[in-house]
Each structure stands twice: as structure tokens, then as C-alpha cells.
Amino acid sequence: MSLKVGSKVFYPTHGAEWIKEKKEIEFKGEKKEYYQCELINSPLEISTPVDNIEELGIRPVLKSTEIKDKIKVLKKTPKDNPKNKDFNDLVSTFDELHENADLESKIKLIQYCNYVKEKREKDGRLIPVTIEKELDKAILDIVGELAVSAGVKLD
């Protein structure tokens, strides 16, 4: 993957970001090239070793038209049954989807969370905080990627 200063990327654990600069950092006596990245959804900046980009699952941000096309599925299918036997299995499914770090995984997270929320509401049960957090994170990741793709900053 060919990245440079100004590239728009998606970092699985942090979300969408811009590569602000490339710099050399000495760590434990070893000098390495790093990308300094500005996150869309946080005031923090992170440094990522250039050599580890692919290992970390960092990928280029999709084009905004592609993102909009892909999220249209949520209009037709806002929820989907995760078919898990228990809540721990569901959390494991969420972890697997986070590892993929692609847009389709974020959409699937939203569908699963919507399904669980609706089912629990019908059953008169509380909605676990985990479901709300997963839903918020997936939505924020999609909105962040769309904003970075379009060159817009979130306020």
C-alpha cells in the first residue's frame, strides 16, 4: 500500500484519520520512520510505524460515493439476527467484526445491535451497555470515514 502525507486512512482501533506528516523517531535506540496521524473523532494524534501499516490493518479510506452506496443496505435491512446462543458469543462476533475493520463489518455490527435492541425491547428486557457502545462506535466509524473521505472535519 502506497501512503504519503495527506493520505486518508482507516485505522481499525482508532477510526478514520489523515496522515499529517512522516517523521523519524528513535525508540529503544532504534530509529524508525513513522506516520503522524490526525484522528477525525479525537483531539489525539498517533504515531504509527511505516513498516507496520499492513500488520495493523490500516487501509485507505473508501470514496464517499462508495460509502454512501454501501450503507444504503441499512435502509432495506436495518437489523439482522446474529444467531448467537448467548451474549458471550455475540461479544466474540463483535470482536471478529472489529478485526475485519471494513465498512461491511461496521454495517453488520449496526444490524446486529439493532436486532438485539428490538428483541430486548419487545421482551421488556434492559439493553446492555455493550450493545449501545458497539452501535455508537460503528456509527461513529462510518461517519468518520465518510467525513475524512469528503475532506470534512467533525466539530
Label the model's feature ranges.
Residues M1-L56:
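A positional/architectural concept
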Residues D51-D155:
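Charge/polar-rich, low-complexity and marginally structured segments
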